[in-house]
UniProtKB/Swiss-Prot annotation:
Residues 253-275 have a biased composition (Low complexity). It is found in: Late endosome membrane; Golgi apparatus, trans-Golgi network membrane. One of its GO terms (biological process) is lipid transport. It comes from Pongo abelii. This is Oxysterol-binding protein-related protein 9. Residues 231-368 are annotated as: Disordered. InterPro entries: OSBP_sf, Oxysterol-bd, Oxysterol-bd_CS, PH-like_dom_sf, PH_domain. The modification Phosphoserine is found at residues 306, 324-326, 329, 611. Gene3D superfamilies: 1.10.287.2720, 2.40.160.120, 3.30.70.3490, Pleckstrin-homology domain (PH domain)/Phosphotyrosine-binding domain (PTB). Residues 2-99 form the PH domain. It comes from the Eukaryota.
Length: 736
């Protein structure tokens, strides 16, 4: 990679309350992103400010393809490229720079000082692997002799040629590395501790003592011994052994003209030392601007007990990931709270409801902060936009419940749900559906710290029910054929099942027999890494069915985002959702607004409800999905639509643990939940690992026996997952 990349970007400033054009120079070797008001100012060395990249984190917005952020030194700087392609170029270059300097910091902090002997050892290992590969090459000849089909023979020959070419390249690389080692032995410095980093206003200046190996391609510069290599286990193969620089001559590389009216693509080029006025100053200790008017999210760290400016644990990643190295490095102090207080959920009396709902996770805010280095190690292995479905997350960030149980929180206001069928007019029923829908999200998160629920095991089930506020003890007739057969017909019952593991799909169903209303949904969760955030796309749909009116309201779900994942995480929702009733023609458009990079409020929603064939809505709703939402009707009436602060949350009721089947959520996860409760992270991790291994073993057994997995309560119908015995089907059968 070139030592310097430069070009125009826009940078947000608070003074102007908007974007300002700046000329940026990325110095790969110094780990510095400097910016100037123009190209001319850059050539004169008049730097406006700089961003240190060691330990920095890049963030992107899933809904905006041109902006990105760099978070470092307790500040978040906001940038805007011309388009998605230009942003991708900058992000790729910045990621490589950050990774290089962060890995160097890891190596230095852990006390590891690489030597030529370490280099030689790795060369020997590489040569041994090469010999194994050469032996494997001989198998191609056997394959060709036994191959009868011409088409298959051509494929094998092509693969053999490609492999031969790769082997030759590896041979060449090993020879060049050997030459570099020999040259280093001959010319290395006496003290072996001279640093190559001479940071200046814009570019990296090689040390005059640094040897240039003329026999190597592109005239590779071999760095001094202490920083020439990181631990081989930590350095990705895509990174060079040392900084690769072309010999700096007296010519200048042309750069884009800063006087142009529009953006031009960033130019990656090597620049001569005469290109700018060099400064003897070292890299600034902190990122800075000539005036602190830049937009950054200073409040992102105000809840954090320690400064996030050093994102790598001083003990190095190796010691952090070895839980047993210090005995209790990841354990939390014991608590006197018993398992029963958090998990026992009876079937009668005052102990009926779920005490999980009364938990307060605020006290656990520190766990994410104290294990930040583990998260940093984990996220150093992923790239922006990468699918996180198969990435194993550390146990301490888990919430003490399954994702299936979290979906039950859609019905934390069951009275609003069943009142849909009480409305006599189709217009009022649509308004009530929207009201219930907008009230359904806030109950899922009561603590201030966002955590991730357990990934359900294939075939896992969760069952619960709610007693309506005005329900009396006289309504004792049970729904024997319903999803929760031990409750009365006036209750709202809920059941969920993990119907697929790859992709992860959950299906859930709820009903109220007496109100003749049911709900069926399926959600496929797809996670994506966004730098400072994790995005979860909820792919799927739900259907509210009012059976007395033969109406079906199809709805979609917003995406979820875990923000500030390196400090105190918080959750927001984002995306456009729709609710449609094909029979009546009523519809609603709902937008969950994510907090913009530059100002704005969190958790905003706007909604429009439309009559059949009308392009203008008869009701507009705006507010916060976890706060107060206001409705404005076409008649001029203004009213509170939903006030989640005043709405009482009705507790769900779950069978006692000892009464549950083995595959029910709380029974499956009881060991993980208990150990998370007492903050024994090692034991929780081990319990989680046992569950996952059992699931893998069962999958292998089914594959060997060629057996298809059979779901318990749901079946696939086209692209949807439908409950086997919904209320609609049971009522229809009863009529015949």
């Amino acid at each position: 990679m070139a030592s310097i990349m430069e070009g125009p970007l826009c940078k947000w400033t608070n003074v102007m309350k908007g974007w300002q054009y700046r000329w940026f120079v990325l110095d790969y070797n110094a780990g510095l992103l400097s910016y100037y008001t123009s190209n001319d100012k850059m050539m004169r060395g008049s730097r406006r400010g700089c961003v240190r990249l060691r330990g920095a984190v890049i963030g992107i917005d899933d809904e905006d393809d041109s902006t990105f952020t760099i978070t470092v030194d307790q500040k978040t700087f906001h940038f805007q490229a011309r388009d998605a392609d230009e942003r991708e170029k900058w992000i790729h270059a910045l990621e490589e720079t950050i990774l290089r300097h962060t890995l160097q910091l890891q190596g230095l902090d852990s006390g590891f000082v690489p030597s030529v002997q370490d280099f030689d050892k790795k060369l020997t290992e590489a040569d041994a692997y090469l010999q194994i590969l050469i032996e494997q090459l001989k198998l191609f000849d056997d394959k060709l002799q036994n191959c009868k089909e011409d088409e298959q023979r051509k494929k094998i020959e092509t693969l053999k040629e490609t492999t031969n070419s790769m082997v030759e390249s590896i041979k060449h690389c090993i020879v060049l590395l050997q030459i570099a080692k020999d040259q280093s032995n001959a010319e290395k410095h006496a003290d072996g501790m001279i640093s190559t980093i001479n940071p200046v206003d814009a570019i990296y200046q090689p040390s005059p003592l640094e040897p240039v190996i003329s026999t190597m391609p592109s005239q590779t510069v071999l760095p001094p011994e202490p920083v020439q290599l990181c631990k081989s286990e930590q350095r990705p193969s895509s990174l060079p052994v040392g900084p690769v620089l072309a010999t700096l001559g007296h010519h200048q590389t042309p750069t884009p003209n800063s006087t142009g009216s529009g953006h031009s693509p960033p130019t990656s080029s090597l620049t001569s030392p005469s290109h700018v006025n060099l400064s003897p100053n070292t890299v600034p200790e902190f990122s800075y601007s000539s005036s602190e008017d830049e937009f950054y999210d200073a409040d992102e760290f105000h809840q954090s007990g320690s400064s996030p400016k050093r994102l790598i644990d001083s003990s190095g990643s190796a010691s952090v990931l070895t839980h047993s190295s210090s005995g209790n490095s990841l354990k939390r102090p014991d608590t006197t709270e018993s398992l029963n207080s958090s998990m026992s959920n009876g079937t009668s009396g005052a102990d009926l409801f779920d005490s999980h709902d009364d938990r307060d996770d605020d006290a656990e805010a520190g766990s994410v902060e104290e294990h930040k280095s583990v998260i940093m190690h984990l996220l150093s292995q992923v790239r922006l936009g990468m699918d996180l479905t198969k990435v194993v997350l550390p146990t301490f960030i888990l919430e003490r419940r399954s994702l299936l149980e979290m979906y039950a929180d859609f019905f934390a206001h069951p009275d609003l749900f069943v009142s849909i069928s009480d409305q006599k007019d189709p217009k009022d029923r649509m308004v009530q559906v929207v009201k219930w829908y907008l009230s359904a999200f806030h109950a899922g998160r009561k603590g201030s710290v966002a955590k991730k629920p357990y990934n359900p095991i294939l075939g896992e089930i969760f069952q619960c029910y709610w007693t309506l506020p005005n329900d009396t003890e006289e309504n004792t007739e049970l729904v024997s054929e319903g999803p929760v057969p031990w409750v009365s017909k006036n209750s709202v019952t809920f059941v969920a099942e993990q119907v697929s593991h790859h992709p992860p799909i959950s299906a859930f169903y709820a009903e109220c027999f007496n109100k003749k209303i049911q709900f069926n949904a399926h959600i496929w969760t797809k996670s994506k890494f966004l730098g400072m955030s994790i995005g979860v796309h909820n792919i799927g749909q739900g259907c509210v069915s009012c059976l007395d009116y033969d109406e079906h309201y199809i709805l979609t779900f917003p995406n979820g985002y875990g923000r500030s994942i390196f400090t105190v995480p918080w959750v927001e929702l984002g995306g456009e959702c729709n609710i449609n009733c094909s029979k009546t023609g009523y519809s609603a458009n709902i937008i969950f607004h994510t907090k913009p990079f530059y100002g704005g409020k969190k958790h905003r929603i706007t909604a429009e409800i439309f009559s059949p064939n009308d392009k203008k809505s008869f009701c507009s709703v705006e507010g916060e999905w976890n706060g107060v939402m206001y409705a404005k009707y076409a008649t001029g009436e203004n009213t509170v639509f939903v006030d989640t602060k005043k709405l009482p949350i009705i507790k769900k009721k779950v069978r006692k643990l000892e009464d549950q089947n083995e595959y029910e959520s709380r029974s499956l996860w009881k060991d993980v939940t208990f150990n998370l409760k007492i903050r024994d992270i090692d034991a929780a991790t081990e319990a989680k690992h046992r569950l996952e291994e059992r699931q893998r073993a069962e999958a292998r057994e089914r594959k060997e026996k060629e057996i298809q997995w059979e779901t318990r309560l749901f079946h696939e119908d086209g692209e949807c997952w439908v409950y086997d015995e919904p209320l609609l089907k049971r009522l229809g059968a009863a009529k015949h």
